Amino acid sequence: MSTSREDSVYLAKLAEQAERYEEMVENMKTVASSGQELSVEERNLLSVAYKNVIGARRASWRIVSSIEQKEESKEKSEHQVELICSYRSKIETELTKISDDILSVLDSHLIPSATTGESKVFYYKMKGDYHRYLAEFSSGDAREKATNASLEAYKTASEIATTELPPTHPIRLGLALNFSVFYYEIQNSPDKACHLAKQAFDDAIAELDTLSEESYKDSTLIMQLLRDNLTLWTSDMSESGQAEDQQQQQQHQQQQPPAAAEGEAPK
């Protein structure tokens, strides 16, 4: 007997409570592939499911990459480095599978069925995010492809957000937060990152009095994250000076810096 849409959503919530995120993904993927537009609750459940599944692997990748860098600096550690490299590749395979999975659902079902500006921004932001996650560990042509796809998705989301969502909308703010992280961490463009983050923050501040009570907490939280990133980035830029681009490239390839805050849709 096939599981109903209502049951799949309930099982996804149950899996979330049990912290069984792979099963949460499977249940929400079933709902997302139905061809019907998702409700706000359903799309948030989908986002949370994939975010937890990939978030664990991204954290693992950063830790293993850091250990790899330390071992490479030691003498007589060639065998250990080979083991670490193999283990890192295993994590990268998992990251690729998860990202390709949600990107396929987005392109085949969610984006084509989206009818509101809010849902379109939400899904194009997700598309930008998961291509960005691929770019984090890829190299060569694969990295260039993921970077370009991420940039295109973020730009599309931004164009829609600018015309259809107010500056204080949490999804528009979350998009600005993640798009600025893309500029800083993937494209090594701190100036673009800071400009985008500051513009989003300033635009939201200017219309803070129009903020609805229901989204006040979510919006102000993301605004704080934007400000935190600006503080972190401007500090890094002043310390690094002319060596910024080279340093950022080395950090990406070897050891990840303290991660900038990213924004997710409120539940």
Swiss-Prot record:
Residues bearing the modification Phosphoserine: S89
Low complexity: bias regions: 243-267
Covalent link location (Glycyl lysine isopeptide (Lys-Gly) (interchain with G-Cter in ubiquitin)): K76
InterPro entries: 14-3-3, 14-3-3_CS, 14-3-3_dom_sf, 14-3-3_domain
Protein origin, superkingdom: Eukaryota
Region feature Disordered, mapped onto this chain: 236-267
CC per GO annotation: cytoplasm; cytoplasmic stress granule; nucleus; plasma membrane
Positions in coiled-coil regions: none
SUPFAM superfamilies given in the database record: 14-3-3 protein
Family to which this protein belongs: Belongs to the 14-3-3 family.
Function: Involved in growth regulation.
Complexes and interactors: Homodimer. Interacts with NTH1 (via N-terminus when phosphorylated by PKA); the interaction is direct and activates NTH1. Interacts with FIN1.
Name the UniProt record assigns to this protein: Protein BMH1
Species of provenance: Saccharomyces cerevisiae (strain ATCC 204508 / S288c) (Baker's yeast)
